[in-house]
Amino acid sequence: MAPGRELGAFLLALLAFCGGRRLAEAAGGPGGRRGAAADACGGRGLSSVTKSNGLLNITFKYDNCTPYLNSVGKHVIGDVQNITISQYACYEQVAVTILWTANAIGIEYLRGFRVILEELKSEGRQCQQMVLRDPKQLSPSFKRTGMESNPFANLKFETDYFVKIVPFPSIKNESNYHPFFFRTRPCELLLQPENLICKPYWKPRNLNVTQQGFNMQVSFDHAPHNFGFRYYFLHYKLKHEGPFKQKTCKQDQNTDTTSCILQNVTPGDYIIELVDDTNTTRKTMHYALKPVHSPWAGPIRAIAITVPLVVISAFATLFTVMCRKKQQENIYSHLDEESSESSAYGAGLPVERLRPRPKVFICYSSKDCQKHINVIQCFAYFLQDFCGCEVALDLWEDLKICKESQKEWLIKKINESQFIIIVCSKGMKYFVEKKNWKHRGVTKDTGKGELFLFAVFTVAEKLRQAKQNSNDLCKFIAVYFDYSCEGDIPGILDLSTKYKLMDNLPQLYSHLHSRDLSVQDSEVFPVNVSKRNYFRSKSGRSLYVAICNMHQFIDQEPDWFEKQFIPFLPHPLHYSEPVMEKFDSGLVLNDLVNKQAADDDFYLKTDVNIISAGSSDSHCIIQHLNLGEDVETQDIQRGGSSVLRPLLHAVKASNLKDMPRDSGIYDSSVPSSELSLPLMEGLLTDQTETSSITGSVSSSSGLGEEEPPVITSTKFLLPGICKAELHCHIHTDELQAIAPL
């Protein structure tokens, strides 16, 4: 029994040894993926930096660099250290294995390495990718653990190379990691000295390339006869194209040089390589083959290029002229003709003037650009002249606002008006929402002290009360022009009626006259009000041009609002000298400078005093709003005085006696708003000549003939100071005459 037991134990031990060896080969361990290549190369030069030294082992998944992993990270990983090169022979060529240790900087973020080997004077490049397998994350204790790559084979003897080891993911890119330069050993050191590979081999002293039309002639001095070369091979290709093409050259027996002709090659930069039939001789050069210019190439090419360009240009010019002509016909077809339709429309105007004119108050943002202000002025004049409305606009009533105070005038107009039109824009949306954010605890907004915010919140409160009391909400209208969008309407105005101008112009016209018209009387008013013909009138043409100018401004500067207000840096309010502003039309406008009083501008006590003179519902509105401006008013009062802005800007008239009439006097033959119309800029020359009628002064009631105004000299009002006692001191000065519109 004893010998049997000993034999069984021996067989079990032998089986365990063989099975354990197979499992070890399957697992691989450190450098397991390079085992096959290392065995093929005899296992020479393998590193044992991680073996039998008591350090922690690391395993990697080895592959080439084709599977792309994002190498960009958020942390810095330092350069590897202690780079060593292990060289050995593999299939009668040089093979190397690179060894290194990781840097402690960023080692916890390390996920792998890219090992890039490149010949110093060639374009050849080899790359290996090592992805960390175990452990998943390294700690600083691994900084002394050695790491090694798979063998890089097929290298040349006595050739300069450099290796670059790039850890990833790192915030540094490949170019920020330093290369390690080395030179491969001679053939005699890696192979036996008697090996044929290590014997001296021949290289041609001269390799010349000449161009012969579309052909290249390659000449070189061939090897002596005792070398036994019978053929030479020319490998050539364009620099950035695919594999080499091959041309076989037979050695000339009677000369010392051999020539080969490469026929019908494409012009470009070529790489030419000379190889003998035993593949031991190799010499490379670059040559740029220039294009061939035949005697007829220039004229024929010029004709072939010029004629199509001329034809295309002619068609493009003709198409442009036709489109322009058609556009002019569509827009201005009715401006120069005395048609029966125009006569009927002109005859119908006096009948329309006999009807009650609905009172309209316009509220808008003073924080948008000057082009938007021009649109507001032209829109107000259009409502008054074309739509038969009695318009209240702060730009037309500076003197009255100065006498009554801004908020008193504002509340009065809101209460008196039959309709309140809020022109919504990007600026209104932005600053109204900023005001709401400030009430929720956010930092102070940049729109404090702007009267249009007070107007918007007052209208919103009236809208809310009308909703609660089940009153008619048609008084409140929110409009936006086509250079804005419906999203520019503040959320507090959602209950109002919304119109897009000028697309919904007929609906707005019907809305404004809905209280004065019955179904039987509707034909008295013009029925041809639409987006396509509103510019037939003088006021409509001015509005059309102002909208076009705003479109052109937005096309030139799409981010004009963001540049101006986002982020908006607030600056302390202080009294400043009046600054002259200039509209695009050439009219010089001044802002009205008001002296800050203790009971002025967004102060709750003053609001109560002002509203007590008005209606009782206004009192409730202001108490409910309580715009949170007490702190702001104290800051402003500490600053001394401030600039009180009207809803937009103030337009100054020529003389005190010629000041624009307020909104309560619209029966005159000349509307007061005509003094502030912008010029029709942005049109073509012929369109400007056609539309020059916009410069004439016409009767809003259709009476009288149009005569161009002749302005010889004009007096403009310099900014006055409104004191707390509501006394307005106006100073006049002589200014230079302004050319007529």
From Swiss-Prot:
Stretches for region Disordered: 688-708
PROSITE patterns in the record: SEFIR
Any one GO CC term of the record: membrane
Glycosylation sites per record: 57, 82, 173, 208, 279
UniProt protein name: Interleukin-17 receptor D
Bilayer topology: Single-pass type I membrane protein
Membrane-traversing stretches: 302-322
Residue ranges annotated for the SEFIR domain, each copy included: 357-510
Topological domains, Cytoplasmic: 323-741
Organism this protein belongs to: Gallus gallus
Keyword annotations of the record: Glycoprotein, Membrane, Receptor, Signal, Transmembrane, Transmembrane helix
Lineage: Eukaryota, Metazoa, Chordata, Craniata, Vertebrata
PANTHER family: INTERLEUKIN-17 RECEPTOR, INTERLEUKIN-17 RECEPTOR D
Function summary: Feedback inhibitor of fibroblast growth factor mediated Ras-MAPK signaling and ERK activation. May inhibit FGF-induced FGFR1 tyrosine phosphorylation. Inhibits TGFB-induced epithelial-to-mesenchymal transition in lens epithelial cells.
MF-aspect GO terms: interleukin-17 receptor activity
Listed Pfam families: IL17R_D_N (PF16742), SEFIR (PF08357)
Biased composition (Low complexity): 688-703
Coarse class of the protein's main subcellular location: membrane
Topological domains annotated Extracellular: 27-301
Listed InterPro entries: IL-17_rcpt-like (IPR039465), IL17R_D_N (IPR031951), SEFIR_dom (IPR013568), Toll_tir_struct_dom_sf (IPR035897)
